């Protein structure tokens, strides 16, 4: 079977955005997982920033991974992937000029689409980890991303957090990102269908939701009717891999180790608790 080019895969992603149903992403974190996802029939894979940090650095999601490290992992994945890969590009690794570099590098890696979020990253001294940058700065990042894009088929998605700001600000930000030219809007923190409908009714671009498996948002037909095209349920495949590795090695060693679940394992082996203490001690950052 002939291989699809990166341009072909980007065009396929565009077709998904223009379809009349929603698609659930597969968490792809290395070349093997990308091949498995495509073979099982997933239409889209996602390389999450948190998963990339764990996979590359064994570090928690504290914006420790560099653009170069993230791009290297994306390149490995896209070298073999025969499904569109969506990159969680966090805040674009800096200001609007850094966003341009991020888009250029990820496009060259073969990514089909990427999200640029308006979270204040990395967290600043004395600020909450969920604080957002100003709307005008965020719009500048979207415009810069579009300027840096060479292949017009690659989708630029503006992301905001509906769980930490009020309804009117969510609408204002999403509409501003649409006006700036974003190909879709990614929403985090949607609570239920009433919450989603109140926002979706004010927007015109396709929507992407990060739900983390929220049981209140599991009706695919209703999601599609509200304009949702991409759903990210989380990264269960990655955490299942961590759990399987731990269980296999524990059995092989025949040691009396604790039977930890995937979440406990990721916290333990990424030394996440240390980073929380350091952030509070040296930066006065609170979760």
UniProtKB/Swiss-Prot annotation:
Binds 1 Mg(2+) ion per subunit. Keywords: Decarboxylase, Lyase, Magnesium, Metal-binding. InterPro entries: ICL/PEPM (IPR039556), Oxaloacetate_deCOase_bac (IPR023687), Pyrv/PenolPyrv_kinase-like_dom (IPR015813), Pyrv_kinase-like_dom_sf (IPR040442). Its cofactor is Mg(2+). GO terms for biological process: oxaloacetate metabolic process; propionate catabolic process, 2-methylcitrate cycle; pyruvate biosynthetic process. It catalyses: oxaloacetate + H(+) = pyruvate + CO2. Substrate binds at residues 50, 159, 235. Its EC number is 4.1.1.112. One of its GO terms (molecular function) is magnesium ion binding. Pfam families: PEP_mutase (PF13714). The keyword Metal-binding applies. It comes from the Bacteria. The keyword Magnesium applies. Mg(2+) binds at residue 88. It is an enzyme of class 4 (lyase). Belongs to the isocitrate lyase/PEP mutase superfamily. Oxaloacetate decarboxylase family. Catalyzes the decarboxylation of oxaloacetate into pyruvate. Seems to play a role in maintaining cellular concentrations of bicarbonate and pyruvate. HAMAP family: OadC. Homotetramer; dimer of dimers. This is Oxaloacetate decarboxylase.
